[in-house]
Amino acid sequence: MRVCFYTLGCKVNQNETGALAQLFEQNGFTVVEEKDGADVYVVNSCTVTNFGDQKSRKWLRRAKRENPGAVTVLTGCYPQAFPEEAAKIEEADVVTGSGNRHAILQDVQKVLNGEETKVVDIRPHQRGENFEELPMDRFADHTRAFVKVEDGCNRRCAYCVIPRARGPVRSRSERSILEELRRLAASGYCEVVLTAISLPSYGKDTGTGLAELVEHAAAVAGIERIRLGSLDPDMLTDDDIRRLAAVPKLCPQFHLSLQSGSSKTLRAMRRPYTTEQYAAVAAKLREAFGEENVSITTDVIVGFPGETEQDFEDSMAFVAGQRFLKVHVFPYSRREGTPAFDFPNQVPEHEKESRSRRMTAAVEKVRAELAHAAQGRTAQVLLETPLSSTLFTGYTKQYLPVVVSAPGHKSGEIVTVTLGEWDGKRCRAQAQ
C-alpha cells in the first residue's frame, strides 16, 4: 500500500507529518510523492488562517477526483478547531484532530477494509492530558533535525485560534527528548532545532524549564548545534538568558515574537508586553551574547483591526530600530472563532496589502545592511544542500543564509568560512 502526505503550516506540523510517515512505514506502507499515485492521501492541516482551510479542502478534492478509489484523510489543527465543519467535508473519508495521532492508522484501516465508509475521530483536548509521543528518527534533510518538545498554548491572543486547535500546554519528558537526541546523533545529525507550539512554556507543567533542557541537550555527544523555535519576550527571564548564554552549543539566533511595533496594537491583540518591555529583553540578549554575535528574528502582523496609519508607522519605526535579521510580515487574516474577528474598524484588504509591502521593504533593507556588515567576518556554517561538488547552501549560527565554496567537504559538516558579498538572498562564502 502507498501513502502520500501533504503538509500545511508550521515546523511542528512538518515534524508531526514525518512522524506519521514513519508510523505508516512501520506498518507496511510506502511513502510516495503525489504524482506517483497512492492508496491513502493524508493532509496535515493548518488553521491559522481561512486560506489554510481552503488549501486543505482543495487538495482533498483534487486527490479524490484523480484517485476516486483512494482513502483521503484530513487531520490536524483544522478539524480540531472546527470539528463540525471538517466532519461535513465529503472528500474526506477519515477526519481526525491534532491529538491521538496513533489512531489514524486504525481509522484508515477501517475504511480500507470496508468496515466503515467514513470515520470521524476528533477527540477534545483536556486539561491534564499528557504529551503524545510521536517518535521521529529521520528527516529529508540529513543535516538538521527538528525535535518537538511541547504542545499546546495557554494564552488567548485576540487573533489566534491555536489554543482551540492545540489544547493546553503539555511538555514532553526530558528523558524522552534526550533519548531522541542520542538516536539522532547516532544517525549523523549534528544540529537540532527544539520546536513547540509554545516553546518558553516548556516545563511549566512539570516543574522544569527550557534553560535546563538546553543545558542537558548540549551534553549529548554528537550534537554540535542547538537552535530554539519561537520565544515570547515576557516568558524569557534574566536567569534564562544568563544560563542560555553559558551554553556554547546554542546558536545565538532568537526568534523573539513581536507581532506589532505599536504598544497600542499589542494591547488590542492581547499580547502581554509593551514595545518597551520587548526592547529591554532584546537588549539583554544582545548584551549576553554579544552585539555582533547575536541575531534576532521575528513576526509582524500589519493591518490588525483598529490599526491606524500612525499606529502602522510607529510599528514600522520600532521594527526598523530593532535591526532584525529577518522578519516574517503577515497582513492580518480575519479568523472566525477568534475575538478579533468581531472587532470594529477592520482594515480594508487593499490597505493591509499596502502596509505589508511597505513593512517588507523596510525590513529587507535592514537585512541587506546587516548582511553587508558581516562581509569579511569569519563564521561557522553547517553545509547542507550541495549545488555542485564544491558548492553548498547553509546557515551561519546566526541563521544568515550562505552559499559556500568548500572543495573537499560534504553535506553535514560544519566548516569555518569567510563571509563575502550579499546577493539579495544569500551571502557568498569561502571555506577556510
Predicted regions located by residue number:
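Radical SAM/AdoMet-radical enzyme domain recognition
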Residues: A186, A211-R225, L236-T298
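Terminal RNA-binding accessory module
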Residues: D342-Q432
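Hydrophobic, well-ordered secondary-structure elements that form the walls
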Residues: L256, D299, V319, V327, ...
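Proteins enriched for Cys/Gly/acidic motifs involved in redox and nucleic-acid/cofactor modification
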Residues: M1-Y202, D239, L244, L250, ...
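Contiguous mid-protein beta-loop-alpha structural module that forms a pocket-lining wall or clamp
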Residues: E307, Q322-F324
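Conserved glycine-rich "GG(E/T)P / GGGxP" loop and the immediately following alpha-helix
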Residues: T47-G52, Y189-V220, D232-D239, L266, ...
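Conserved strand-turn element in the central/C-terminal portion of the radical SAM core barrel
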Residues: C160-G167, R225-D234, S260-R270, L285, ...
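Short, surface-exposed connector motifs at secondary-structure boundaries
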Residues: R2, N67-P68, V220-R227
